[in-house]
């Protein structure tokens, strides 16, 4: 019984080790993909000036952790684009903006640049840069 129990124990350890290696490979692959996507987003946004707000509309964890980490000098606004108080801001949203919403902003004097689906860490979102084409006083009238 002693030798068969030892062999069974060694076999169990080998199976668990094999499963652990497989889990590590899957996790590492996911981590690498997230890192590539995060770097792409960070390179696109760069270092925004302090008056540029970061507006997030319900993207999980983005508004209260991730954006504060990457953009500590910028104001983070949790809400939709109507709650931005700056005349230029990055808008992170879980769903693409409707054509009507974009047209409404353009009609109100804003330029809307659509960067499509992006990602920070494990959090995907649609990214827009919105800025007033008119003077700031016009932009505040939304």
Language-model-derived ranges and their functions:
Residues 6-124:
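Catalytic lumenal/periplasmic loop and adjoining terminal transmembrane helix
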Residues 120-141:
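Core SAM-dependent methyltransferase catalytic element
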């Amino acid at each position: 019984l002693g030798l068969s129990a030892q062999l069974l124990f060694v076999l169990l350890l080998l199976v668990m080790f094999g499963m652990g290696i497989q889990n590590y490979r899957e996790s590492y692959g996911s981590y690498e993909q997230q890192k590539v996507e995060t770097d792409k987003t960070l390179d696109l946004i760069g270092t925004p000036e302090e008056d540029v707000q970061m507006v997030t509309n319900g993207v999980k964890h983005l508004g209260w952790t991730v954006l504060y980490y990457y953009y500590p000098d910028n104001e983070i606004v949790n809400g939709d684009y109507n709650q931005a108080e700056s005349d230029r801001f990055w808008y992170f949203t879980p769903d693409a903006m409707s054509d009507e919403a974009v047209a409404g902003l353009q009609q109100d004097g804003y330029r809307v640049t659509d960067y499509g689906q992006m990602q920070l860490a494990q959090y995907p979102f649609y990214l827009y840069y919105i800025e007033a084409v008119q003077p700031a006083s016009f932009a505040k009238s939304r």
